[in-house]
């Protein structure tokens, strides 16, 4: 008998009046907001403009959702196109079913389009948003908890998740919460990328490649624990092979990129340059205007000093002329007196 377990929600949908709020969709939305928030902070710290990450996310997120859904439907086509299934269910994304591989691939295409429109380098943008994507995955995985899906093998561990209703016909009970394992792993991946980026100044897409490699390593062993139906190739689940292949590509990219383009590239946005130039021009104009005002004020002070000096010197000259006239008069009087004595 289980002493403790993680209870599953009694329902995955809450109704706010006439509006249904599905737990799966809510987790995805929260994850997107967290990814954009963290990505924006990292982008600005690298020299980019605020708002660029959100603008590019407008392209990346829809592409990612479409790609994730396509990957899920293609790899699990029997759930929608086999006998007795309704193919319309393939469009019901709110009921769950997103493949992270398709989401990352198509999301990268959308981000590339958005980055080109903004004139920013795609590798630098990918490095900035990498840990945010990992956190978004950590939050999004809790959507599986709301839908009671993608759990692992049966277990009586204290942290087992209780499954009360199963759509695949399995017996209700307690199972490994693989959604929780992957959520915690993704948080660790985000912290790893942030630390490595600060420690080694990762650039040219290497921070994003590190995120991909680290996620694939965790996904490989977590995939072994899942019991949901999946295609197998040579004894391994399809997602195991995908994780292994993508992991090798990411590691190869890190090695080759570090050799060819070491260090971190400078982020220069066209809009950021213009804004900086406008600020510089305004500052130059202010300085120039201040200097002109000071020169004009100095000229006025000089004119006032000249006038005052002239006014001061004029009385001195007049006084000198008066003294000369008085001396001549005194001399005349003296000469007259002498003449009178002689006579």
Swiss-Prot record:
Topological relation to the membrane, as annotated: Multi-pass membrane protein
Pathway, per record: Protein modification; lipoprotein biosynthesis (diacylglyceryl transfer)
Residue ranges annotated as compositionally biased, kind Acidic residues, are 314-324
According to the UniProt record, which cysteines are disulfide-bonded? none
Which stretches does the entry tag as region Disordered? 269-343
> Where does this one sit in the cell?
Cell membrane
GO terms for biological process?
lipoprotein biosynthetic process
Write down the top EC class of this protein.
Answer: transferase
Q: Which UniProt keywords apply?
A: Cell membrane, Membrane, Transferase, Transmembrane, Transmembrane helix
EC numbers on record? 2.5.1.145
Residues reported to bind a 1,2-diacyl-sn-glycero-3-phospho-(1'-sn-glycerol) = 141
PROSITE patterns reported for this sequence: LGT (PS01311)
What parts of the sequence cross the membrane? 19-39, 54-74, 93-113, 119-139, 176-196, 202-224, 238-258
Protein name per the record: Phosphatidylglycerol--prolipoprotein diacylglyceryl transferase 1
Q: Which species is the source of this protein? A: Streptomyces coelicolor (strain ATCC BAA-471 / A3(2) / M145)
Identify the coding gene. lgt1
């Amino acid at each position: 008998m289980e002493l403790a377990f993680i209870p599953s929600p009694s329902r995955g949908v809450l109704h706010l009046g006439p509006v249904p709020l599905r737990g799966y969709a809510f987790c995805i939305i929260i994850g997107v907001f967290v990814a954009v928030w963290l990505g924006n902070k990292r982008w600005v710290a690298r020299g980019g403009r605020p708002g660029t990450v959100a603008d590019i996310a407008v392209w990346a997120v829809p592409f990612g959702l479409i790609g994730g859904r396509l990957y899920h439907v293609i790899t699990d086509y029997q759930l929608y196109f086999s006998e007795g299934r309704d193919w319309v269910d393939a469009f019901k994304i709110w009921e769950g079913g997103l493949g992270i591989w398709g989401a990352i691939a198509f999301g990268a295409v959308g981000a590339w389009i958005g980055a080109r429109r903004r004139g920013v380098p795609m590798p630098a943008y990918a490095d900035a948003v990498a840990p945010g994507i990992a956190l978004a995955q950590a939050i999004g995985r809790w959507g599986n908890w709301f839908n009671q899906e993608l759990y692992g093998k049966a277990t009586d561990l204290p942290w087992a998740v209780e499954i009360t209703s199963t759509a695949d016909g399995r017996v209700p009970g307690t199972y490994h919460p693989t959604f929780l394992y992957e959520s915690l792993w993704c948080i660790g991946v985000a912290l790893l990328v942030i630390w490595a980026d600060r420690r080694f100044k990762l650039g040219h897409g290497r921070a994003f490649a590190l995120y991909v490699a680290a996620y694939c390593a965790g996904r490989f062993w977590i995939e072994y624990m899942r019991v949901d139906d999946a295609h197998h190739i040579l004894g391994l689940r399809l997602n195991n092979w995908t994780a292994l292949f993508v992991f090798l590509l990411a590691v190869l990219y890190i090695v080759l990129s570090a050799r060819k383009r070491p260090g971190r590239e400078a982020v220069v946005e066209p809009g950021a340059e213009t804004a900086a130039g406008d600020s510089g021009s305004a500052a130059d104009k202010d300085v120039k205007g201040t200097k002109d005002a000071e020169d004009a004020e100095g000229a006025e002070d000089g004119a006032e000093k000249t006038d005052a000096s002239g006014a001061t010197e004029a009385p001195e000259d007049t006084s000198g002329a008066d003294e000369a006239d008085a001396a001549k008069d005194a001399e005349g009087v003296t000469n007259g007196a002498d003449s009178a004595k002689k006579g």
